[in-house]
Regions:
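Short, acidic/polar
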Residues: 41-49, 105-119
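Short, electropositive alpha-helical surface patch
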Residues: 70-84, 143-153
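Metal-associated gating/positioning segment near the N- to mid-region
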Residues: 10-76, 97, 150
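Histidine-rich, glycine-flanked metal-binding segment
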Residues: 1-12
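Histidine/acidic residue-rich metal-binding segments in metalloenzymes
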Residues: 109-160
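Divalent metal-dependent hydrolysis catalytic cores, especially in the metallo-beta-lactamase
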Residues: 44-71, 81-92, 123-137
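Short, surface-exposed amphipathic charged segments that create phosphate/polyanion-binding patches used
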Residues: 97-105
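A generic secondary-structure micro-motif detector
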Residues: 37-38, 63, 104, 142-145
Length: 160
């Protein structure tokens, strides 16, 4: 735990990263994916974790990926004193936003199988993609089409 001093007052604090994708590098998505194409490049994970350590980050909530990187990161995190939580991969409806960080489904039966797969692989939570992402070119609009409310309710019910 890091401490800062202000007028002889010791204030303990820890930092957390609450929206990470350990497989990405913040520079070039395609190159980041390419690094893990033939298997997880553990050096990328270790580099991120070493950086987190130096910055006092002890908690990471990852959004998952379809490459197995966050699954491996979950195994390595304790070596760095990091509490790492991941859904392993996000779940999206095919044809909607989410392909870059997860696996898709067409039917609720397929969705149910993906929920079971997350649990089998040791996921800490279920991440479902229900909308697109913010489109800053349209003053805060959302890209793509959101899922229907009833469908989202059923997905949440299945996940529980």
């Amino acid at each position: 735990m890091m401490k800062m001093s202000e007028e002889n007052l010791e204030v303990p604090f820890e930092f957390g990263e609450c929206h990470a994708h350990i497989f990405m590098d913040g520079k070039n998505y395609k190159k980041a994916v390419e690094r893990h194409k033939n298997g997880v490049d553990e050096s990328v994970i270790r580099s991120h974790f070493a950086c987190y350590q130096t910055q006092g980050i002890h908690f990471v909530r990852d959004g998952g990926d379809a490459l197995g990187v966050s699954r491996r990161a979950k195994e390595l995190a304790p070596e760095y004193g990091i509490d790492y939580r991941t859904p392993i991969f996000a779940i999206h409806k095919n044809g909607h936003y989410g392909k870059i960080v997860g696996k898709g489904f067409d039917t609720l039966k397929e969705y149910t199988a993906l929920v079971k797969e997350v649990k089998t692989q040791g996921g800490d939570f279920i991440k479902i993609m229900t909308t697109g992402i913010m489109d800053f070119d349209t003053d805060g609009g959302i890209t793509g089409e959101a899922l229907r409310v009833q469908e989202v309710k059923e997905m949440v019910h299945i996940a529980h």
